[in-house]
């Protein structure tokens, strides 16, 4: 019998975080009632709110709560109020990065879906955007050039700097398996992004991904160089299902995927570790300029909650129900001003419309 009682650490954070989190919790209440499972949610301070209350962006009490939870639902952190602090003490670097490191969150999932009702919001040409697309960017988050040896030396004309791209077989294999497992829940197609024509690390990447693919005969695998991937995302994004990327390539391409949808307020993300424990958050920021005005788009937070249900709590049917309700609400023209400028819907209106469709 599958588990029906879960513990979730809710970290709403700053700016629009509390507003969009409240909307997501309304949706979680509706879907948990429908499917008969219980979500025990504990709310804890994070980011600027935690600095104000506890003197640091990531208090130990919050870390402990996360350790005792099945998943973390994260809102947004940061704002002008805390920009005077040293960089490592500011909300973003002082909370999100340490959480990722503490829990070994090496797998970043960034879905990018263009709903038919929003095809005109996409910056892509109409004949391309009208086809729609549904892409999942799987990015390795803790290895590669961002974490390799780096430094500077010399002076004047002889001054130089270097960064080192390094990947181990183990790091590549575990992210590849996540991509193939994710593809099984989708359209069973993985495209591995590399630069194997010039980079030694990409040669190993391609070799390991090929080996892992043998354990997933039902999943189609193809390869693409990163420069071509950047072009094809603009030319024909509908050809992709799961994009498997290293840290650097995934950092760039996941933002491109996000931008061609037309609204960051629609895009969720997940960061997972080896055991499936994850941190789920909207792809956008804390947007302090619109905080408290009731116009923040809650859909990215709501879809992040759906990802949590799917990947950490094993409630895929509940996740699909949320995603379907979101699509239906948007198709009916329900949305905040960032996607429907003249519709007049508030954050709470959007949440209510989605709940009504569950």
Curated annotation (Swiss-Prot):
**Site note Important for catalysis, residues:** 146, 195
How many cofactor units bind, and how? Binds 1 Mg(2+) or Mn(2+) ion per subunit.
Q: Which pathway does it operate in?
A: Amino-acid biosynthesis; L-leucine biosynthesis; L-leucine from 3-methyl-2-oxobutanoate: step 3/4
The subcellular location is: Cytoplasm
Q: Name one GO cellular component term.
A: cytosol
Single GO BP term: L-leucine biosynthetic process
Q: Which residues bind NAD(+)?
A: 79-92, 285-297
What residues does substrate bind to? Answer: 100, 110, 139, 227
- The residues that the entry says bind Mg(2+) are 227, 251, 255
Task: Write the record's keywords in alphabetical order, separated by commas.
Answer: Amino-acid biosynthesis, Branched-chain amino acid biosynthesis, Cytoplasm, Leucine biosynthesis, Magnesium, Manganese, Metal-binding, NAD, Oxidoreductase
Question: So which cofactors does this thing need?
Answer: Mg(2+); Mn(2+)
Pfam families (alphabetical): Iso_dh
Tell me which EC number(s) this protein carries: 1.1.1.85
Q: Which reactions does this protein catalyse?
A: (2R,3S)-3-isopropylmalate + NAD(+) = 4-methyl-2-oxopentanoate + CO2 + NADH
Molecular function, one GO term: NAD binding
UniProt xrefs under HAMAP family: LeuB_type1
Role description: Catalyzes the oxidation of 3-carboxy-2-hydroxy-4-methylpentanoate (3-isopropylmalate) to 3-carboxy-4-methyl-2-oxopentanoate. The product decarboxylates to 4-methyl-2 oxopentanoate.
Similarity remark: Belongs to the isocitrate and isopropylmalate dehydrogenases family. LeuB type 1 subfamily.
Subunit description: Homodimer.
Q: What is this protein called?
A: 3-isopropylmalate dehydrogenase
Originating gene: leuB
